[in-house]
């Protein structure tokens, strides 16, 4: 019996369902464009087989292991390495067994839908993973991973991915992107400039990062001008390796518009380590404005992922480091926070700043009205905790009336779990098709327009 319903996410009403199905069929086979995510470029540079099912489904995916941790499974038992270098559980079969036993916890969640889709459509599995069949399915997947058809590049091609963007720190040497480029492989994997480590004074090792920033760029980062020049240098380096965007994961959307002398004084104070929390927020905000001005110069699209309370568990952060499933949504202001930046660049039609939020309460009140007015702003798709059927539906319902469809930017999967990419894009295409079918059947959109919008999204 298939794990996935062919009519999943479509409306119950027959007329709406038939139209949603037709809309979906018109876009289902379009190539996947993945403009923001966290896949490891080493997969495509080396094109070595994925080691085992646990390394593919569990270890890299904090959507998965955070659920298991919430049910009392120790993180180390899931193969996650500690910050001090100690390895977690090394036996992939034990990790897989934890996962199989926990599979019921994913019922009704988007992760459960993505996992079912991956097991069925990538590996041909038609039974629900459980403790009873854990070893049988493990052996089946492991056998498939040993074949050429399941190497990273082959999967990339079978997933019909047109382009995939990874995300690298400003200090990254991009060696794996260089190797991909030199390999002659035709798959398009590009990088994205993520400068958080050298623009956020609260980022661990910030001062050491700034020193390294100066070393790799040859700029005098003791000065404000030299520091900005270092960013321009790295942005150019990233562009050479395919980057089309920068990405900024800030705790808030706060921006600043300081004078040159004010910025110099603040930067000196930041480097001294004798700054306040308000100084750190002001500096992050000034750097968003500086990055926007640089985007006007070099053409990089700017993505702002604001409002995540990073590393909420001190215990997990201390033991295992960042990006371990303990980043939590927080309330986020955009109207007041973005005004300093918008006063500088908001009316620039040749600049694209994509706003993402984890605070759904601001969809209709703040970000849709902003993007529906300022030519520099676009709305990013539902992000992280909200890239689900219900999340996409809420997003469309609360933003379309004010911002329309063409002030949004389509879908991105934002994933570390490679096999979930087709599943996530499938959910997005189905969800948008369902929403469009509702607009048509309630007389708010012509059917011909709905098919055109579906293609454009």
Enumerate the predicted regions with their spans.
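Short, basic/hydrophobic alpha-helical segments
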Residues: 340-345
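C-terminal amphipathic alpha-helical interaction region
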Residues: 302-304
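Hard-cation-handling environments
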Residues: 313
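Active-site loop ensemble at the mouth of alpha/beta enzyme cores that anchors a bound cofactor
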Residues: 317-329
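Divalent-cation-assisted or electrostatically stabilized phosphate/pyrophosphate-binding catalytic cores
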Residues: 332-337
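Internal, well-ordered alpha-helical scaffold/interface segments
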Residues: 339, 365-368
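Metal-cofactor-binding active-site regions of metalloenzymes
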Residues: 2-33, 37-298, 347-361, 368-457
């Amino acid at each position: 019996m298939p794990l996935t319903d062919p009519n999943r996410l479509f409306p119950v009403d027959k007329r709406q369902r038939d139209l949603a199905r037709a809309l979906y069929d018109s876009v289902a086979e379009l190539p996947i464009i993945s403009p923001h995510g966290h896949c490891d470029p080493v997969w495509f540079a080396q094109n070595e087989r994925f080691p085992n099912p646990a390394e593919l489904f569990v270890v890299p995916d904090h959507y998965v292991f955070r659920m298991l941790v919430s049910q009392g499974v120790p993180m180390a038992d899931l193969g996650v390495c500690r910050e001090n270098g100690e390895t977690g559980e090394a036996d992939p079969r034990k990790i897989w067994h934890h996962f199989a036993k926990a599979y019921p916890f994913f019922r009704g969640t988007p992760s459960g839908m993505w996992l079912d889709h991956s097991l069925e459509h990538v590996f041909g599995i038609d039974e629900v993973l459980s403790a009873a069949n854990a070893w049988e399915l493990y052996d089946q997947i492991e056998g498939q991973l040993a074949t050429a058809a399941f190497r990273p590049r082959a999967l990339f091609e079978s997933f019909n991915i047109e382009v995939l963007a990874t995300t690298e720190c400003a200090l990254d040497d991009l060696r794996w992107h260089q190797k991909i480029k030199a390999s002659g492989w035709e798959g398009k994997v590009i990088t994205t400039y993520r400068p958080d480590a050298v623009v956020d004074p609260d980022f661990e090792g910030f001062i050491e990062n700034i020193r390294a920033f100066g070393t790799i760029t040859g700029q005098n980062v003791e000065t404000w001008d030299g520091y900005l020049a270092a960013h321009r240098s790295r942005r150019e380096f990233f562009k050479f390796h395919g980057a089309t965007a920068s990405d900024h994961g800030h705790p808030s959307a706060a921006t600043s518009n300081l004078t040159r002398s004010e910025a110099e004084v603040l930067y000196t104070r930041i480097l001294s380590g004798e700054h306040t929390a308000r100084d750190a927020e002001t500096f992050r905000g000034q750097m968003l404005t500086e990055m926007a001005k640089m985007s006007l110069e070099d053409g990089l699209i700017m993505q702002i992922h604001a409002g995540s309370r990073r590393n909420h568990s001190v215990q997990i952060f201390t033991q295992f480091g960042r990006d371990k499933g303990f980043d939590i949504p927080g309330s986020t202001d955009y109207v007041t926070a973005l005004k300093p930046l918008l006063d500088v660049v908001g009316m620039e039609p040749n600049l694209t700043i994509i706003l993402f939020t984890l605070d759904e309460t601001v969809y209709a009140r703040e970000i849709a009205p902003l993007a529906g007015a300022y030519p520099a702003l676009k709305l990013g798709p539902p992000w992280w905790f909200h890239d689900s059927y219900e999340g996409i539906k809420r997003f469309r319902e609360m933003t379309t009336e004010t911002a329309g469809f063409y002030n949004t930017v389509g879908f991105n999967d934002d994933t570390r779990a490679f096999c979930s990419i087709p599943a996530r894009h499938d959910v997005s295409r189905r969800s948008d098709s369902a929403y469009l079918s509702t607009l048509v059947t309630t007389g708010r959109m012509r059917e011909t327009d709905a098919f055109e919008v579906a293609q454009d999204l």
